[in-house]
């Protein structure tokens, strides 16, 4: 299966630290339509574990992909319902 | 004797009907419990008002709200400082009583040292782009976290309720907190 997906919205929280990447991701995904994908860009290394934990513990979201790109951590979250 | 048999038969059919009713009753309450369980709850008691100790309840409250939890933070004693709109912006860090501080207690006890350590901490918070107490509190309020101010300590410590952030609940006591805790999936005392 192809991993390709369209990004609906991008949230840039570069420079911000815990708990803001998770908190702002939650607020941003609320505005994404069902089936849409939120791209979240963070420089917080803790966001890799935190976003994974948040996505697992939260209804209606699915973590599609996480990419570590140097100092940048990219997260792709789908709104499922 | 002869009357026993039909009545015993009645009893059995009654029992079956009762069992059926009981099963339905239990199924209903299981469904209710499951519906209840879907809504996770966290209850935090915040008792400290120093800059370092104001962070944990607010970070956990905003994060739990991001998870979709119903969150209540009950503030009592020095924890009320966090709800005070002006003073929450100027919370202090104590330079004594913490052996991990870079200054020994005898130095930390010099007048003005709390101001120095507080300034150092504020600078780090700023340099690190860590959210401020005010930012965390307002974000949490926006996300539906309920902040409660303990009535007894409001009066004991002579707070003016009008000086709390808008949206703070007053007129609550230990029984409210206890009920929240009994209902919550996570209970914390900070």
Identify what each model region corresponds to.
Chain A
Residues 8, 57, 76-79:
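Generic signature of intrinsically disordered, low-complexity segments enriched in small/polar residues
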Residues 1-7:
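Haloarchaeal acidic low-complexity proteome signature biased toward cell-envelope/secretome components but also
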Residues 2, 51, 70-73:
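Generic intrinsically disordered, low-complexity segments enriched for polar/acidic and small residues
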Residues 11, 40, 75-77:
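Preference for bulky hydrophobic residues occupying beta-strand positions
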Residues 62, 67-81:
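C-terminal edge-of-domain segments
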Residues 7-14:
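Short amphipathic
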Residues 13, 19-68:
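Amphipathic, hydrophobic secondary-structure cores in small proteins
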